[in-house]
Amino acid sequence: MATFKDACYHYKKLNKLNSLVLKLGANDEWRPAPVTKYKGWCLDCCQYTNLTYCRGCALYHVCQWCSQYNRCFLDEEPHLLRMRTFKDVVTKEDIEGLLTMYETLFPINEKLVNKFINFVKQRKCRNEYLLEWYNHLLMPITLQALTINLEDSAYYIFGYYDCMECENQTPFQFVNLLEKYDKLLLDDRNFHRMSHLPAILQQEYALRYFSKSRFLSKGKKRLSRHDFSDNLMEDRHSPTSLMQVVRNCISTHMNDCEWNKRCHVIVDAKNYISIMNSSYTEHYSVSQRCKLFTKYKFGIISKLVKPNYIFSNHESYALNVHNCKWCQINNHYKVWEDFRLRKIYNNIMDFIRALVKSNGNVGHCSSQESVYKYIPDIFLICKKEKWNEAVKMLFNYLEPVDINGTEYALLDYEVNWEVRGLVMQNMDGKVPRILNMNDTKKILSAIIFDWFDTRYMRETPMTTSTTNQLRTLNKKNELIDEYDLELSDVE
């Protein structure tokens, strides 16, 4: 029983403005839709159901019925979902605008209540006040919202969400923004609405209001790779594939600094209808490059590492070793389809082997060494503390020599041409015979930064950018990168 969905269905019949604003895919005829994957709340109709991916941001936040309208909370078009979406910092004035919008779209007065009651009583055996028949009148005005952190911004999607106790498999979390407003003013507003209802409905209205306005906010979730769908990718088998984003726009662009003022546009119904008549869609192809995806890929590699290679005498690259049960790696995993990751793995292992061999370690493939447990962490460049600790333990394992208070390790074993070039690039044009700890860190990080320079990466994919940001980046030709040409970050 989705209260918000029911309210939209009944209230859209009131006038022309409501019929335009409150049109939901969940209340229309069902059309073929993508397969659902996660359990959560549809941001468009607020019902708890199975969710599918959004074509605007790749997050799972829309039900299979609402997906037909392709609405995203990051759109520019002021549809109902966009007008309910606020961005930090939310002020009391912003909330006043939201409450005014609610009162405009979902009014409760004596005349309207009688109209709905008479409509219900026209049906056979409906003289009682059963809650399912009057569900649309039982939606209180609250400051309940689902929130998500994207880059440096927190977004709040206000609405009336039932079943808060149910399992949430999405990155959105419930928050109560009542502290940003006056509790007594909100109470008064709802008591006034409630006073027009029959006594039996007043009790249910009050119960719903207090349960949805006095709850404790939950801690914000951290995004993971699995929160984003692969369905927006042009070629799901290509690791450098672009992601196709569709955004709903209007002819009169509004600046992002006025994000929270979008709900004010319905004050003038004629102007709002004119704005919506100018709506159109913009399509963008964006890179999937970001820390979130990179961290996920390196996490997989760290679990596949065969550290025995650093003591081996194989002439081939680490990924090309065959017929050696200690060094041969399973390269059938999808992650190895990315040529950048193959290069990084081969070069990191080649450089570490050169360090180990240069410092008198004459082990072989089957050796069981204490340093092995730290090798996988050297690929976790996004986890700085763990990465630094791994490099430190590797360097100490080399038994460096103290010279004037600084410890040095030898580097006189042959490395491949790619590694040699990177070493020269980062060590003033030459390959040094001795390295200190900082030199070792610089070279190891340079091998990774050559293709994945995480220092300058976004935290989340560009699909989570606002429409204005996408438009600006597109003009600068910064939505895509040159990996398909095998050009690295440095090049």
Swiss-Prot record:
InterPro entries registered for this protein in UniProt: Rotavirus_NSP1
Keywords for the protein's UniProt record, in alphabetical order: Host cytoplasm, Host cytoskeleton, Host-virus interaction, Inhibition of host innate immune response by virus, Inhibition of host IRF3 by virus, Inhibition of host IRF7 by virus, Inhibition of host RLR pathway by virus, Interferon antiviral system evasion, Metal-binding, RNA-binding, Viral immunoevasion
Region (RNA-binding): 1-81
Keyword match Repressor: no
Ranges for region Interaction with host IRF3: 320-491
Annotated compartments: Host cytoplasm, Host cytoskeleton
GO BP, sorted A to Z: symbiont-mediated suppression of host cytoplasmic pattern recognition receptor signaling pathway via inhibition of IRF3 activity; symbiont-mediated suppression of host cytoplasmic pattern recognition receptor signaling pathway via inhibition of IRF7 activity
TM region positions: none
Molecular-function GO terms, alphabetical: metal ion binding; RNA binding
Domain of life from the UniProt record: Viruses
Biological role: Plays a role in the inhibition of host innate immunity by inducing the degradation of key host factors required to activate interferon production such as IRF3, IRF5 or IRF7. Associates with components of cullin RING ligases (CRLs) including CUL1 or CUL3, which are essential multisubunit ubiquitination complexes, to modulate their activities.
Family per record: Belongs to the rotavirus NSP1 family.
Subunit comment: Interacts (via C-terminus) with host IRF3; this interaction leads to IRF3 degradation. Interacts with host IRF7; this interaction leads to IRF7 degradation. Interacts with host CUL1 and CUL3.
Name of this chain's protein: Non-structural protein 1
